Amino acid sequence: MLFPAFSILLISFFSLLSVVTTKTQYWCHGDGVLNNQHTCRFFTIVIDAGSTGTRLHLYKFIHDPAIASHGMPFKVEKEIFQEVKPGLSSFAKSPSSAADSLEPLLQRARKEVPHFMWEKTPITLKATAGLRLLPGDMADDILESVEERIFNSGFFAAFPDAVNVMPGSDEGVYSWFTLNILLETLFTDEPTVGHKPAAHRSVAAFDLGGGSTQLTYWPNNEAVFSEHVGYERDIDFFGHHIRLFTHSFLGNGLIAARLNILQLETDNEIESTHQLITSCMPEGYQLTEWEYALKFWNINGSSSHSFESCYGTTKNFVESSEIMHLRELKGSPVYLFSYFFDRALNSGLVKGNEGGKIELRQFKEAAEIACRREKTEIDDGSHWMPWQCLDLTYIYSLLRDGYQFEDNQPLVLAKKIKGMEVSWGQGLAFATANEFQLTEGAIKTALSSEPNSTVVDQIFDLVYSGTNQVLSYFNIISV
């Protein structure tokens, strides 16, 4: 499975033990006693620090030894979701306020996880493109403040990377796992299908964030790796090798694309006054104090306002980016989520969180309608309405001119599947939970025969406290 570069503390400890367990062991939710004989429930906390908000994904997992051999050793039984706004990048001038913004999420997690399970519940916070785009040391200052809050949360913070900026390609990979886990395309309880993952059963995942966009899929034809060198990720997923095609395009997220497209239409002299002009908004309309990456802009509509003009500029931006043609996916349904889903929902292309199937041409048709609206029609108080013409036009151009899908390309838009969010959070939670539980099981197995129970307890206390004293401590008792 794809594991985070986990705690130096635990990895070193695990290496020193040199133990291979014959059975995976899990912390039981009922009494907190480690065993591998009974159905167990345990938790993992993932905090998604995105460009527009910070989201808690708290997962309650269940492990049933009776069915674990059929594929995945545990499954999500329940997801708790909560979001706070704005995103961490909005606190660039006050890092301590960024840490304070997490408190409602941490309080919710403390409420949901039994107290005796806190130290057995791993927590991780991953920031995405919003922080990547901050200048200078601003991102580091925010992360330092946030890290202190996470490490003092009462949960198990996996040193040293419990808090960091997630590489864009990891977003894509974890999102792909979440999607395919929820759709049961990798493992299924249906005996006629089999329990071994296969490329032809999996689906492609397209994620559109604020600062970047990601695509990930499992190619049937591995020639694509020769055409696009560097887009390959070899993954071990619960003992099965998977070779994924994945890439993240920084600057092609929806909010970042807005600024890039607006700048293409605006003369440098006008732009220097923090004024931007766009044919994607009607003449006479002005959007004041729009903020992105700590800069404020006034956006002005144009007399050339139309879908054709807006599309022309948008297409120029998309074609100048690194988005590539994906022949293998043509005609096959691909799954779109995040801002893809949100803008489709705003436009009435789908209804409700379950989403639905559409064709690419419907994004174009929705964009044409949005681009015909007059000044009074877009000034209705909705934060997305003034941008609807540009956003829908960009999404259409990204898929049509970037990935070069035809207008009849089938698209599946999803926000939730089986009542759970489609995001990279669940994929990361599986990786984090499995790494944590395997390490805990190995330590417990290795020390179960230790005659001095006080020594065993002290080692676990050191592990849970996150102190690097455990290394020197273990060297002492190894002599």
Curated annotation (Swiss-Prot):
Swiss-Prot/TrEMBL induction comment: By stress such as high temperature or ethanol.
Activity vs pH: Optimum pH is 8.0 for UDP and 7.5 for GDP.
Briefly, what is this protein's role?
A: Hydrolyzes UDP and GDP but not any other nucleoside di-, mono- or triphosphates. May promote reglycosylation reactions involved in glycoproteins folding and quality control in the endoplasmic reticulum.
* Residues in the Cytoplasmic compartment per record: 1-7
Q: Which residues form the active site?
A: E171
Q: What is this protein called?
A: Nucleoside-diphosphatase uda-1
Which InterPro entries does the entry mention? GDA1_CD39_NTPase (IPR000407)
Q: Which GO terms describe its molecular function?
A: GDP phosphatase activity; metal ion binding; UDP phosphatase activity
Record's catalysed reaction(s): a ribonucleoside 5'-diphosphate + H2O = a ribonucleoside 5'-phosphate + phosphate + H(+)
GO biological-process terms attached to the record:
GDP metabolic process; UDP metabolic process
Write out the similarity annotation. Answer: Belongs to the GDA1/CD39 NTPase family.
Q: What cofactor(s) does the depicted protein rely on?
A: Ca(2+); Mg(2+); Mn(2+)
Q: Which residues lie on this side of the membrane: Lumenal?
A: 25-479
| Organism encoding this protein | Caenorhabditis elegans
